[in-house]
Curated annotation (Swiss-Prot):
CDD domains: Kunitz_huwentoxin (cd22598)
Name this polypeptide is given: Kunitz-type kappaPI-theraphotoxin-Hs1d
Signal sequence coordinates: 1-27
Propeptide stretches in the record: 28-33
Site entry (Reactive bond for trypsin), positions: K47, A48
Tissue expression summary: Expressed by the venom gland.
Site (May bind Kv1.x/KCNA): L39
Chief subcellular location: secreted
Highest taxon above the source species: Eukaryota
Function of the protein: Serine protease inhibitor that inhibits trypsin at a molar ratio of 1:1.
Length: 88
């Protein structure tokens, strides 16, 4: 019975890998992670007012960040945003 469980686990993990592998190669991934430059701006959950920059698909735009939460499409300067997100 122990060998059957091991074989079942190996089969499950193999199927999981085959199903998820194409997603890892999709255009929304960059260096194995979701491309942060495609995420929408996200103010976060708090009420602070920090000036930050996000990439809107064309250029970097200023927005007010609340200080907590949000996503990774948030940069301290326009220059940092353009360096990470602008296509050459």
């Amino acid at each position: 019975m122990g060998i059957a469980r091991i074989l079942s686990a190996v089969l499950f993990l193999s199927v999981l890998f085959v199903v998820t592998f194409p997603t890892l190669l999709s255009a929304d991934h960059h260096d194995g992670r979701i491309d942060t430059c495609r995420l929408p701006s996200d103010r976060g959950r708090c009420k602070a007012s920090f000036e930050r920059w996000y990439f809107n698909g064309t250029t970097c735009t200023k927005f007010v960040y609340g200080g907590y939460g949000g996503n990774d499409n948030r940069f301290p300067t326009e220059k940092a945003c353009m360096k990470r997100c602008a296509k050459a």
